[in-house]
């Protein structure tokens, strides 16, 4: 089905395109159910697999050693149980891929608000944030607004200073609610005038910025 391109969707898509092209670090935040993950997946799925290595992490309660294992496996490196060996292997491989310009590596972390501080600190060490001005891959963090509290920690200042793109979702306006509902109805071959004009204001008031809640309200209205 065709995705509805809201202002938030377009803003996040454009910013994702920019940081992927510039090998930057992006943070995208919103309340639950506003479409961040959908937008992230749509962008990642559109990338050429012969050009990009995409590492998608959603199990964000992982430990530091789990994090290294995931990166190690995704990069096709030698298996080892030693954290120090994995660290060196991953760092060298990222540098090699960058210097030879063979592949672009993207690490995308979803539900970032649950990410352990120890894992974020590993990002700092792995990427040489304290000493090196060069970025070896694109880092994308998508999560709820609470992630900001973690980013404000003093120990994460080197990481925070390197973030070059951030966006917080604003949610649908009333006109977008109508356009979204009409597009949903059309996608299932329903008449686009099933809802009266005043219904859109009610839906807008009840959805509380959540597209997920809006979908539930639409479905219940049609039963």
Residue ranges and their predicted role:
Residues 33-34, 60-64, 113-115, 144-149, ...:
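Conserved nucleotide-binding/hydrolysis micro-motifs of P-loop NTPases
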Residues 1-22:
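A short, basic N-terminal segment
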């Amino acid at each position: 089905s065709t995705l509805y391109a809201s202002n938030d969707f377009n803003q996040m898509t454009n910013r994702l395109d920019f940081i992927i092209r510039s090998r930057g670090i992006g943070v995208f935040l919103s309340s639950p159910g506003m479409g961040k993950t959908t937008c992230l997946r749509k962008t990642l799925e559109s990338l050429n697999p012969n050009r990009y290595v995409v590492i998608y992490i959603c199990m964000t309660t992982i430990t530091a050693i789990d994090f290294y294992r995931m990166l190690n496996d995704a990069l096709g490196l030698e298996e080892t149980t030693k954290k120090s060996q994995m660290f060196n292997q991953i760092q060298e491989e990222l540098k090699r891929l960058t210097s030879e310009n063979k592949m672009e590596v993207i690490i995308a972390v979803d539900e970032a608000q649950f990410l352990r501080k120890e894992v974020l600190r590993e990002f700092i060490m792995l990427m040489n944030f304290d000493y090196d001005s060069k970025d070896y891959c694109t880092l994308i963090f998508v999560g709820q607004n609470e992630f900001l509290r973690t980013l404000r920690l003093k120990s994460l200042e080197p990481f925070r200073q390197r973030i070059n793109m951030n966006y917080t979702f604003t949610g649908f306006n009333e006109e977008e609610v109508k356009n979204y509902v009409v597009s949903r109805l059309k996608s299932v071959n329903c008449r686009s005038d099933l809802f009266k004009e005043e219904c859109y204001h009610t839906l807008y008031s009840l959805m509380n910025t959540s597209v997920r809640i809006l979908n539930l309200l639409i479905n219940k209205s049609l039963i």
